[in-house]
Amino acid sequence: GDRFEIWEAFSLSYPLFINSIIVKFLNATTVDGYNPYRITNAGIDWEVIEPENPWSNIGYWGDHQIIYLLKLLEISNKHTPETLSTLLNERIFAFANVPYRLKSYADIVANPKDSIVFDDKLHQQVLSLTPQIGQDARLVLDEQQQVLLTTMADKLLITLLAKLSNFVPNAGIWMNTLRPEWNDANNALVGYGASMVTLAYIRRYMSFLQEFIVSDVNIATETYTLLQALHSALRMPSTKQVTDMAGLAGEQYRQKAYAGLSGQIVTLPLCELRTFLSDTLEVIDSSIRNN
């Protein structure tokens, strides 16, 4: 996280590095739309539970990937407006293979302070593969044991859709990944809090995407399904219907992502993306106004 804060300042001083930084950032997001604990010289790193250390913990700081990424995207757009958008449909982006598994929606509702399972088997697999393939062992691999690659558009949308699957109307983004939001006064409310600050940043992120994406984009078929499910969910009449349908859409996406993404890419027409963004912004704006 702190590295990302430094990157923001660094990229203002050295703007030509900005797009490399964004690529590095996106290559470190997970299939379920979060960021690993840190990036070191040895690659992507995550926390593990240490039985002898009462302070050890696992989880995701939910706001990082929206806020820091957005700042970097805005800086890039200001300094080299055309360059970044040429990467939108390039299949050059990998996924961090963090061995955390978010539970089902029903389980998270039942106990939002116990929402993530540490996948010890996957953790051991990664460790045993590392001597053979190096840092690539910490990335998601396809059936041929090659690094699974997707487009920048897919990455940008997965991050957004993961957040929207935790949207609670008039409350904000539900903080259910065992970590507080860094930028929110409700810092302590892990599991039971919802962040209005992150919702406001999502609003800004979506406004950015409206300007930034000006043609059809190629995304994973699983992402497309999630986008359509959330589009329906967010237009439901009651708060409970929105929250339940969005939460279940997120769960169904995660089940597919954890089992192994197909690698199939489909075209999301610009008109459909724009309708989704504008409809969703209306719902978000109503929540922001009500607060």
PLM region spans:
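Acidic, mature catalytic/reactive cores of soluble proteins
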Residues: 1-291
